[in-house]
């Protein structure tokens, strides 16, 4: 019996992985333009990091983490999200002491959550995320959102929308929390066990419940916007003003809360409105986390960031029938005819690769017709034919596969000649 891939994971094979590489390359390029630097953190962290950093009332911590004990009986967890590990590294490596503040970081990496697999939702998935730590300026909130929108636009997506909300500062959240408890408590017995446990710990999370989202109390729950104090309201207005100036359209949704405990002030999601995208329309989301650095043991430092699913981005590209400009060709295929030419063909291929070209050759002693078919499948720009006659003359026959033109090139200058033709 063959061993199958674990449920909720996928193999990304040649022919498809080039799409991922292109997307990741574009992510790195936009981060370069916005001056975000790459950070790489471990795939597993101490479980305590996520208990404190993500919140013990969240679905992630309660139901979705892959946790285990190592041989030293330490509880470790495969990272379910990227913000807490980045903030942990920021604190541990004292990045808050750097002269250039805020600290602007990005990551591209695998995350792990034990969820029910479905379209756009895997148990192992890849996120591209950014974090800007050290500034309370609303301009950086707008910058983070604008970066995400510009990235999607650069991919060619047109059917996207930004949904925006504010959770306010700590005082605003407390006032809203008290109002939510008063609203839900008399009838909390009608809600699921998760909502009942969240009533005292974090009633805001009740609004994010999938089981009871159609309960009548959900529609009449007090909105956070009713409890924003003056400072929070001014901050929210400024973020909206800046987004408008940056030509980033958005919709306000007072019910948007996001699924993590660390958010304050700005929260947002970017969604696909493409037909046929599927039930899960969220492409990315993020927000401001002004207490998280302290929670993880650092100084009082504000931060904001987002994370986007590469898998869902690919779904959105397919839903909008977008073909990205991905190169699937090689520069040259070396055809060897006869035993004498085989060893020389290996040397020719080596010299071409040394000159910086993408090159392939036959390794199965196939006939010339079959070798040319291989060159076609690999979309070779040139085919170099080397037989015993060519060896005796000290030449190689070079065929341009686009025009069909052929020419004889001296063997000793062949690599540099082909390289110049491809410049």
From Swiss-Prot:
Subcellular location as annotated: Cytoplasm
Pfam families the UniProt entry points to: HGTP_anticodon, tRNA-synt_His
Catalytic activity: tRNA(His) + L-histidine + ATP = L-histidyl-tRNA(His) + AMP + diphosphate + H(+)
Any one GO BP annotation for this protein: histidyl-tRNA aminoacylation
GO CC, any one term: cytoplasm
GO function terms (MF aspect): ATP binding; catalytic activity, acting on a protein; histidine-tRNA ligase activity; transferase activity
InterPro entries with a match to the protein in the record: aa-tRNA-synth_II, aa-tRNA-synth_II/BPL/LPL, Anticodon-bd, Anticodon-bd_dom_sf, His-tRNA-ligase, HisRS-like_core, HisRS/HisZ, HisRS_anticodon
EC number: 6.1.1.21
Top EC class of this enzyme: ligase
Chief place where the protein resides: cytoplasm
UniProt keyword list: Aminoacyl-tRNA synthetase, ATP-binding, Cytoplasm, Ligase, Nucleotide-binding, Protein biosynthesis
Family: Belongs to the class-II aminoacyl-tRNA synthetase family.
PANTHER family cross-referenced by the UniProt entry: HISTIDINE--TRNA LIGASE, MITOCHONDRIAL-RELATED (PTHR43707:SF1), HISTIDYL-TRNA SYNTHETASE (PTHR43707)
Subunit description: Homodimer.
The name this protein goes by in its record: Histidine--tRNA ligase 2
Organism listed in the record: Bacillus anthracis
